[in-house]
From Swiss-Prot:
This is POU domain, class 4, transcription factor 3. The keyword Mitochondrion does not apply. GO terms for molecular function: DNA-binding transcription activator activity, RNA polymerase II-specific; DNA-binding transcription factor activity; DNA-binding transcription factor activity, RNA polymerase II-specific; RNA polymerase II cis-regulatory region sequence-specific DNA binding; sequence-specific DNA binding; sequence-specific double-stranded DNA binding. Acts as a transcriptional activator. Acts by binding to sequences related to the consensus octamer motif 5'-ATGCAAAT-3' in the regulatory regions of its target genes. Involved in the auditory system development, required for terminal differentiation of hair cells in the inner ear. Expressed in the chochlea of the inner ear. InterPro entries: HD, Homeobox_CS, Homeodomain-like_sf, Lambda_DNA-bd_dom_sf, POU, POU_dom, POU_domain_TF. Disulfide bonds: none annotated.
Length: 338
């Protein structure tokens, strides 16, 4: 009985210990499963943390380098250690990512603003030209923490502020051109030259303002006569003078080209633009015509030709005078009756 009782604990002991070892086995298996991806996850977390620290440090260095200028030369060895301690990208799980303590424990890694400013100066032109569009930045993993993206945004802003000379070469040429056009002496000389040529062409200021709409220049319509007058008298504002100068110069070139073409072919323009001049008859000829009219108010064509030859006038002038004189007599008689 005792043997049976003695066997029962030993028989039940494996049964009781089985779940215990099974639970330990499952617990260790669970712990092993949890610990296996831990380096990768931990690496990703610290990778984004390291890159965030580096991005913030570079942004602060960029702001500092703008105010203090260049104080330290560029050191390739320091650049090598700084860049080698931090991986280029956190997308590769196989590359070991160092802990942030490595930045402070290494003898070559004191956070120096002047050195980081020089490093930022050498890096940021390439990034500004490429628009930070490198493949490493274009393919970003979904596990990156949001504060990492914010730090990169601050870095982009700092790079844009610390390198105004990257845009300066492109705006240098328009600045030189605007300086030439905005010279007050040049504007004054052009206004005087424009006025003289306009008068020579026989065009009024109102005609110039109305003709500007025919140039088909975008944003330019007809202008008033007072605007052209103020331009010629230099009473417009400086900015308006600069804006109006190329428009008036374009009109002047077109008007002078049309004037030269008109002078080269006068037979095409004289027929339509010829104006009849008003004929003035001197007092002696006028008294002679009144004497002939008293004798014969309706002379024949031969008589009109003889009178014109005698008074040294054109036949058509004598004929029109007799016609006008008859109309005058009719009006006088009509007014006397009524």
């Amino acid at each position: 009985m005792m043997a049976m009782n003695a066997k029962q604990p030993f028989g039940m002991h494996p049964v009781l210990q089985e779940p215990k070892f099974s639970s330990l086995h499952s617990g260790s298996e669970a712990m092993r499963r949890v610990c296996l991806p831990a380096p990768q996850l931990q690496g990703n977390i610290f990778g984004s943390f390291d890159e965030s620290l580096l991005a913030r440090a570079e942004a602060l260095a960029a702001v500092d380098i703008v105010s203090h200028g260049k104080n330290h030369p560029f050191k390739p060895d320091a650049t090598y250690h700084t860049m080698s301690s931090v991986p280029c990208t956190s997308t590769s799980p196989t590359v070991p990512i160092s802990h942030p303590a490595a930045l402070t424990s290494h003898p070559h890694h004191p956070v120096h603003q002047g050195l980081e400013g020089d490093l930022l100066e050498h890096i940021s032109p390439t990034l500004s030209v490429s628009g930070l569009g490198a493949p490493e930045h274009s393919v970003m993993p979904a596990q990156i923490h949001p504060h990492h993206l914010g730090a990169m945004g601050h870095l982009h802003q700092a790079m844009g502020m610390s390198h105004p000379h990257a845009v300066a070469p492109h705006s240098a040429m328009p600045a030189c051109l605007s300086d030439v056009e905005s010279d007050p002496r040049e504007l004054e000389a052009f206004a005087e030259r424009f006025k003289q040529r306009r008068i020579k062409l026989g065009v009024t200021q109102a005609d110039v303002g109305a003709a500007l709409a025919n140039l088909k220049i975008p944003g330019v319509g007809s202008l008033s006569q007072s605007t052209i007058c103020r331009f010629e008298s230099l009473t417009l504002s400086h900015n308006n003078m600069i804006a109006l100068k190329p428009v008036l110069q374009a009109w002047l070139e077109e008007a002078e080209a049309a004037y030269r073409e008109k002078n080269s072919k006068p037979e095409l323009f004289n027929g339509s633009e010829r104006k009849r001049k008003r004929t003035s008859i001197a007092a002696p000829e006028k008294r002679s015509l009144e004497a002939y009219f008293a004798i014969q108010p309706r002379p024949s064509s031969e008589k009109i030709a003889a009178i014109a030859e005698k008074l040294d006038l054109k036949k058509n002038v004598v004929r029109v005078w007799f016609c006008n004189q008859r109309q005058k007599q009719k009006r006088m008689k009509y007014s006397a009756v009524h």
